[in-house]
Design a protein with these regions (language model features):
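A short, N-terminal "cap"/entry segment at the start of jelly-roll beta-barrel domains
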Residues: 1-11, 92-152, 167, 236-255
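Structural motif
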Residues: 43-45, 52, 68, 78, ...
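Glycine- and acidic-residue-biased ligand/ion/polar-headgroup-sensing regions
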Residues: 32-44, 173-185, 190
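Conserved short histidine dyad/triad with adjacent acidic residue
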Residues: 2, 15-30, 139-143, 156-171
Length: 255
């Protein structure tokens, strides 16, 4: 879907595919980048640092720099899959392969002993006039910046009911990818407006004004991937005049 040239920040890539029954990604380390495997339906065996648990979609598991991961589909059905990669060095990818497909893991932890991301809509909370938009959005930050060691800043989940909107705003220090999890709606980036639906992905570069509107029916559910120019630096300016900040700049004490 995207590669290291798609954004100005350190996105490595975003891949989207199916994992067929008996398929997966073998066990490997990353030392200069971070990844997160996500499944959107079914279930799969996720491994982080040699410990394996079964997760059911929609869920993901971040793998930080210096750690290892794998995924295996032991079920009889294909699983919808995404892999997000963010690098420490722009354009640089690394992987140290352990030659272990993780296809016959006998001992699985019923409760994962690694970090996970759950995109269950029941976890969302109402936010009226989100970014000065119309109606009441449902929003949550699924993963914050301190989960990661790179400039990966967050994963947000946003549900816009029919005709509700995420108001016009921009970021000076953050780029985003909006991925449509469910439903349909309208996206505007700068002066371009397009209809979007499940499976679409919209990149938003630095300083680009953007807004979204939920369509009829079930509205518009989005996963938002945020990557900063520097670790822990995040900002939001509200439109249309961008005369003020919704949130002050935040700088990590550990950056």
């Amino acid at each position: 879907m995207f590669n290291s040239k798609s954004l100005e920040t350190n996105l490595g890539f975003i891949d989207r595919c199916q994992i067929t029954p008996g398929g997966g990604v073998g066990h490997h380390f990353h030392n200069q980048c971070e990844e997160m495997f996500i499944i959107f339906d079914g279930q799969a065996e996720f491994t982080i640092d040699g410990r394996t648990s079964v997760l059911k979609g929609t869920m993901g598991a971040p793998c930080r720099m210096g750690h290892s991961h794998a995924i295996y589909n032991a079920s009889r059905e294909p699983v919808e899959f995404m892999n997000i990669n963010v690098s420490a060095i722009k354009g640089h990818y690394d992987a140290f392969n352990l030659d272990d497909p993780r296809t016959h893991v006998a001992m699985k932890d019923p409760i994962p002993v690694f970090m996970t991301m759950n995109l269950d809509k029941k976890l969302l909370r109402p936010v009226p006039n989100y970014h000065n938009g119309h109606g009441t959005a449902q929003y949550r930050r699924a993963l914050d910046w301190d989960v990661f060691l790179t400039n990966w800043s967050y994963i947000d989940q946003l549900l816009l009911p029919p005709r509700a909107s995420d108001g016009v705003h921009r970021h000076r220090y953050v780029e985003e990818i909006y991925y449509v999890l469910n439903g349909e709606g309208e996206a505007t980036v700068n002066d371009e407006t397009a209809q979007i639906r499940k499976g679409d992905a919209i990149p938003v570069l630095l300083n680009q004004a953007h807004s979204f509107v939920g369509g009829s029916g079930q509205g518009l559910e989005l996963m938002i991937i945020g990557i900063s120019t520097r670790r822990g630096i995040m900002d939001t300016e509200l439109g249309p005049g961008f005369e003020r900040h919704r949130a002050a700049e935040h700088k990590s004490r550990r950056s």
